[in-house]
């Protein structure tokens, strides 16, 4: 494994573009086996994929990927940290091989990448000042209060907030930046996935903010069940299919929950939803 600095340095000036789909399912799996290494695109977001205090890649998605790729004959994983909003571009410009960031699956993204079936389902939660003085428990509450909201760059929560009528939306690099913005009074609320919000509040031991209970987002008046999964380049169907087979074996055996539990996931976040269901417009 390599450190953050080594990977970022290696990415400078990358101008490669993805090759066209030849219709044969791609050859990336064979290439990865020959190299013995797979590069994972991560967004530095706990608990999905990030660099730990020891300089090594960690998180639920890299932990899953490490097991699956070893079974596919690829023994090493390397991190490629980038901003969340750059993950799909980075994947399709060949900067790394797989997005391992717990990325939500939606129709817009499905036009650009090939998703494995999701490894988890998730609701949202808010970071608010201690005591939640504005009583923000839903997106509609944020809109009614005229509150200043922040979320991550490229997050699905932006659309949920707009759908609820939220007018003041800032974007920040990650959930830690969001927590600090709430602490310092620059925003009234930071919105993220429930497990992400809970983890960052617990780990920072902040006395100035708190995490709300889980929040169900809505689009067009309908509740949304978000699911997250690994993303592959569209031509690489052979790698995608092999990865998906191993992922389903982990689901059936209960191994998937065992791998994800140390990162704050529970049985409630396990899902049988298929990627194709979330890719439909």
Label every PLM stretch briefly.
Residues 2-4, 8, 21-102, 111:
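Extracytoplasmic small-molecule ligand-binding "clamshell" domains
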Residues 121-125, 205-244, 267-281:
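Periplasmic-binding protein-like
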Residues 67-71, 78-81, 85-99, 112-114, ...:
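Short helices/loops that flank or line small-molecule/ion binding pockets
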Residues 39-45, 115-137, 230-233:
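Hydrophobic/proline-rich hinge and linker segments of small-molecule sensing/allosteric domains
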Residues 62-71, 132-133, 140, 223-267:
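Extended ligand-binding regions for polar small-molecule ligands
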Residues 16-22, 156-169, 241-281:
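Ligand-binding clefts/hinges and TM-proximal coupling segments of bilobed small-molecule sensing domains
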Residues 103-111, 159-160, 188-224:
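A ligand-binding cleft/hinge motif common to bilobed small-molecule-binding domains
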């Amino acid at each position: 494994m390599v450190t953050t600095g080594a990977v970022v340095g290696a990415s400078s000036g990358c101008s490669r573009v993805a090759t066209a789909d030849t219709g044969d399912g791609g050859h990336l799996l064979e290439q990865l086996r020959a190299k013995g290494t797979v590069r994972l695109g991560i967004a530095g977001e706990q608990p999905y994929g990030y660099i730990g205090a020891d300089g090594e890649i960690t998180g639920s998605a890299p932990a899953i990927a490490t097991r699956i790729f070893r079974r596919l004959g690829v023994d090493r994983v390397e991190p490629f940290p980038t901003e969340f909003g750059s993950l799909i571009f980075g994947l399709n410009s060949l900067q790394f091989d797989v997005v391992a960031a717990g990325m939500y699956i939606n129709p817009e993204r499905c036009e650009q990448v090939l998703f494995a079936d999701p490894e988890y389902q998730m609701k949202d939660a808010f970071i608010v000042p201690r005591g939640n003085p504005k009583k923000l428990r839903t997106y509609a509450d944020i809109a009614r209060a005229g509150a200043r909201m922040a979320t991550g760059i490229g997050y699905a929560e932006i659309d949920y907030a707009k759908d609820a009528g939220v007018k003041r939306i800032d974007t920040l690099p990650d959930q830690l930046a969001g927590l600090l913005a709430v602490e310092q009074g620059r925003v009234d609320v930071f919105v993220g996935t429930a497990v992400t919000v809970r983890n960052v509040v617990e780990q920072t031991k902040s006395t100035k903010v708190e995490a709300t209970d889980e929040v169900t987002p809505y689009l067009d008046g309908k509740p949304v069940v978000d699911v997250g999964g690994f993303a592959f380049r569209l031509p690489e169907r052979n790698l995608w299919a092999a990865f998906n087979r191993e992922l389903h074996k982990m689901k059936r055996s209960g191994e998937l929950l065992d791998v994800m539990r140390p990162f704050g996931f529970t049985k409630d976040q396990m899902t049988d939803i298929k990627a194709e269901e979330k890719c439909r417009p």
